[in-house]
Swiss-Prot record:
The gene is purQ. Part of the FGAM synthase complex composed of 1 PurL, 1 PurQ and 2 PurS subunits. Part of the phosphoribosylformylglycinamidine synthase complex involved in the purines biosynthetic pathway. Catalyzes the ATP-dependent conversion of formylglycinamide ribonucleotide (FGAR) and glutamine to yield formylglycinamidine ribonucleotide (FGAM) and glutamate. The FGAM synthase complex is composed of three subunits. PurQ produces an ammonia molecule by converting glutamine to glutamate. PurL transfers the ammonia molecule to FGAR to form FGAM in an ATP-dependent manner. It catalyses: N(2)-formyl-N(1)-(5-phospho-beta-D-ribosyl)glycinamide + L-glutamine + ATP + H2O = 2-formamido-N(1)-(5-O-phospho-beta-D-ribosyl)acetamidine + L-glutamate + ADP + phosphate + H(+); L-glutamine + H2O = L-glutamate + NH4(+). One of its GO terms (cellular component) is cytoplasm. Pathway: Purine metabolism; IMP biosynthesis via de novo pathway; 5-amino-1-(5-phospho-D-ribosyl)imidazole from N(2)-formyl-N(1)-(5-phospho-D-ribosyl)glycinamide: step 1/2. It holds the Pfam family GATase_5. Keywords: ATP-binding, Cytoplasm, Glutamine amidotransferase, Hydrolase, Ligase, Nucleotide-binding, Purine biosynthesis. Gene3D superfamilies: 3.40.50.880. This is Phosphoribosylformylglycinamidine synthase subunit PurQ. The active site is at 85 (nucleophile), 202, 204.
């Protein structure tokens, strides 16, 4: 398997993602967005950063790059696609997943560890965990507040497409444990196909034992 890690102008987490995947013995290649996806691509990761300086809206310009047509085609074919942080914003702007990511409730950039509760452990991105398990991963964003219409959120919940919620260390989903004001504490969701997921927290930054917790490894295992 070769995971294509898409680099846009302003991406800054592509190397982190490459190293985290290599640690798990998952082949990955950083791909410049103008070059398109390699023929041997069997997975796609859209990493974090500030694509195009977050002008207009975070992820809005990158979502309209030609390579995203290839990504949507891969998603329709069931190829694993993961968007992290700015990649999640690009994914939502590019209609890979519902909802939108807007300015944090605090109106400031936040970089801190958070707790996530696994809401559905029967997806490629969460099968390494148990339902209700609490993991710790970092966030680093200024526009990470998940917003969605009430009826669309109800559909996501009914279809078990919410995969992570912000919680406290004991797994309680509360407003106090919500770092950015995301609706219903949502931190990660699936697209129409369970092979497509986006989340604001950074699993690749919690995957290497020499720098900290490794709770994020299970998410990246979804590329196997």
């Amino acid at each position: 398997m070769t995971v294509a890690i898409i680099r846009f102008g302003g991406s800054n987490c592509d190397r982190d993602a490459e190293r985290a995947l290599a640690h798990l013995d998952i082949d990955a290649e950083i791909v410049w967005h103008e070059d398109g996806l390699p023929e041997e691509t069997t997975g796609v990761m859209i990493p974090g950063g500030f694509s195009y300086g977050d002008y207009l809206r975070a992820g809005a310009m990158a979502a309209r790059a030609p390579i995203m047509d290839d990504v949507r085609e891969q998603a329709e074919a069931g190829v694993p696609v993961l968007g992290v942080c700015n990649g999640a914003q690009i994914g939502s702007e590019g209609d890979l997943t519902p909802g939108a990511f807007t300015t944090n409730r605090s109106a400031r950039f936040q970089c801190e560890p958070v707790y996530l509760r696994v809401e559905n452990a029967e997806t490629p991105w969460t099968e390494a965990y148990e339902d209700g398990e609490v993991i710790e991963v970092p966030i680093a964003h200024g526009e990470g507040r998940f917003e969605i219409a009430d009826d669309e959120l109800e559909t996501l919940v009914d279809e078990d497409r919410v995969i992570f919620r912000y919680c406290d260390a004991d797994g309680n989903v509360t407003d106090a444990a919500n770092p950015n004001g995301s609706k219903d504490n949502v931190a990660g969701v699936l697209g129409e196909h369970e092979s497509v997921a986006v989340l604001m927290p950074h699993p690749e930054r919690a995957s290497l034992p020499d720098i900290g917790p490794t709770d994020g490894q299970g998410v990246l295992e979804g590329f196997r």
